[in-house]
Amino acid sequence: MKVRTDFLCELNQKKIWLRREDLIKEKVTGNKFRKLKYNLIEAKKMNSKAILTFGGAFSNHLYATALLGYINGIKTYGIVRGNEWKEKLKENPTLINCVNNGMTLIFVSRDIYKKKNNCAFWRIIKLNPSKFYIIPEGGTNELAVKGCSEMLDKNDNIYDVLCCPVGTGGTISGLIKSSTINQKIIGFSVLNYNNLKSDIDKHTNKKKWELNN
């Protein structure tokens, strides 16, 4: 399918349009595909045997990683926040779809999950991180931003303001990087995360953007 932009309405003499990123690829929609696109290319380039990533029990990122890993013949591992879901797997369609697409799920408590950026985390779960191509929670890294920057092309220069929800900051960072000097980017944060603005600043030096909680 092809991404399209649909007219929604006119408000205060301003026309509002909706970018249909959900049409980009069957089953893996919008920014998830774009975030993983270049990470998968890099994993293959590095001859990685497996991808490991992180997410909550209803994480679209985990599902997208599992499906694209399956399609590309790369084994996937998902660290799931909340070890109670190990006993409730059948109640969770997201995790069931992950398993059905070949992902090995590793359930950890919320306290342990908070340590995922520390060396001690890997000792606790008894895995060697050097054995995996690791993608952070939510999928945001430089390669994800590169993929998300492809949302815009010269045909989008007609828009004055671009808005999007913001989780880990990858999508808005891509939009900021590929926006023109005359465009403003507005993000609406969906998470309670104090360092989000500084994380976005790491990916771009442009200043014509704002983040609303």
For the regions a language model picked out, list residue spans one by one.
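PLP-dependent amino-acid enzyme catalytic core
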Residues: 1-213
